[in-house]
């Protein structure tokens, strides 16, 4: 093999190792949308196209100051927890789209790392949502029991007393009506009046009969 052929082979190896700068920029921009293009280009040129080193620094620059646990809302707010879960789901879908189109191995690994972190956060958020639901359910049941304690349920004695009172109320008008019919003095009905008249008539008849009998005695010879 000639020196020319050796040079040609080595130059071919060098050409295969060269990075497609434009393609790398597109991949990094899709992977780190929050970072500016100038910053991505600066880091890429800083490491002379080293994909692994570039990804590590861009990941560090793109990492928020708060940790995953700190970014999750606490304090029993189910609305915020559900909102955070929705955001994680959206980010997981976006990363999956990038994973389906990315060609660089290092970039694909970085996406997979992000997916893993998001899945862990998603599981933690689901756990917190379940705990808050249980707390809310227990709180509602305890409040219902507390409200039932303040409601007085009548027992057997009170029920019987209410029935006796109601019966007394119903009987009271009857008793009063019967008492109103009784006069202050002795009662003289129609039968007694008729009997007195009949007795008077008998006395009058006897008196007349006795008078006529006496007159006949005196008139006899």
Curated annotation (Swiss-Prot):
GO terms for molecular function: ubiquitin binding. InterPro entries: CUE (IPR003892), CUEDC1 (IPR040192), UBA-like_sf (IPR009060). Residues 156-166 have a biased composition (Low complexity). Residues 169-183 have a biased composition (Basic and acidic residues). Disulfide bonds: none annotated. Residues 131-194 are annotated as: Disordered. Transmembrane segments: none annotated. Residues 20-63 form the CUE domain. Gene3D superfamilies: DNA helicase RuvA subunit, C-terminal domain. PANTHER family: CUE DOMAIN CONTAINING PROTEIN 1, CUE DOMAIN-CONTAINING PROTEIN 1. This is Uncharacterized protein F43C1.5.
């Amino acid at each position: 093999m000639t020196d020319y052929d050796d040079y040609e082979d080595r130059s071919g190896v060098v050409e295969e190792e060269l990075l497609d700068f434009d393609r790398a920029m597109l991949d990094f921009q899709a992977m780190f949308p929050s970072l500016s293009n100038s910053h991505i280009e600066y880091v890429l040129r800083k490491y002379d196209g080293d994909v692994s080193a570039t990804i590590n620094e861009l990941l560090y620059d793109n990492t928020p100051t708060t940790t995953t646990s700190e970014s999750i809302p606490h304090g029993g707010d189910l609305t915020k927890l559900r909102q955070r879960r929705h955001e994680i789901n959206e980010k997981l879908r976006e990363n999956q789209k990038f994973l389906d189109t990315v060609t660089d191995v290092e970039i694909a690994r970085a996406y997979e790392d992000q997916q893993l972190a998001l899945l862990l956060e998603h599981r933690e958020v689901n756990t917190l949502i379940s705990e808050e639901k249980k707390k809310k359910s227990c709180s509602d049941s305890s409040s219902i029991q507390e409200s039932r304690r303040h409601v007085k349920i009548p027992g057997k004695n009170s029920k019987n007393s209410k029935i006796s009172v109601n019966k007394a109320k119903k009987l009271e008008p009857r008793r009063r009506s019967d008492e109103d019919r009784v006069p202050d003095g002795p009662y003289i009905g129609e039968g007694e009046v008729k009997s007195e008249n009949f007795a008077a008539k008998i006395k009058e008849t006897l008196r007349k009969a006795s008078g006529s009998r006496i007159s006949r005695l005196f008139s006899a010879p």
